[in-house]
Amino acid sequence: MFLKALASALVALSVAACGPAGRTELIPVEGDASMGPADAKVTLVEYGSPTCPGCKAWHDNYWEELKRDYITPGKIKFVFREFAIHGAIDAGIFAVARCAGKDEFYAVIDEAFLRQDALVQASLKGDAISELNALGDKFRISADQVKSCINDRAIIRRINDVRSDAQGKGINSTPTFVLN
């Protein structure tokens, strides 16, 4: 039942998010953070942001079930593409996730969803670095490392490239899902 509902919702979201051609081509991007088998017949890509309320609602209501029933058993490959819809705070979260490494990437994103209110409020007050440091600290990333991560040109370039690529495909909001 869940799969039918998810598939219907994803198709609707994917079509709604597509450009004029009505189709978004799913191309692997170097450095994609993925879960599940690399050679899975089904790939689900989420363009998401840990500061997006809609992304948080999806994450809170469906993420664990999707992992348990489809990703962990190897039925699908899931890719989270960092879409910095809210600018610097999202980019900072993504930088911390990238610096945590492949094995901790999704754990950092999960934690950022849990801390969404604090991260957004700190950003609005101009003190995002304090919350980014707290996020990093949870994953043994020092304040100096967080600073280095958020200034890492390769990470910044990837975040900008994902956003540009997404917008080139007509994807302008989060969460947007693309299913092959």
Predicted regions and their residues:
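Cysteine-centric redox/oxidoreductase cores and disulfide-bonded domains
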Residues: 85-174, 178-180
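Extracytoplasmic thiol/disulfide redox context detector
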Residues: 2-86, 160-163, 167
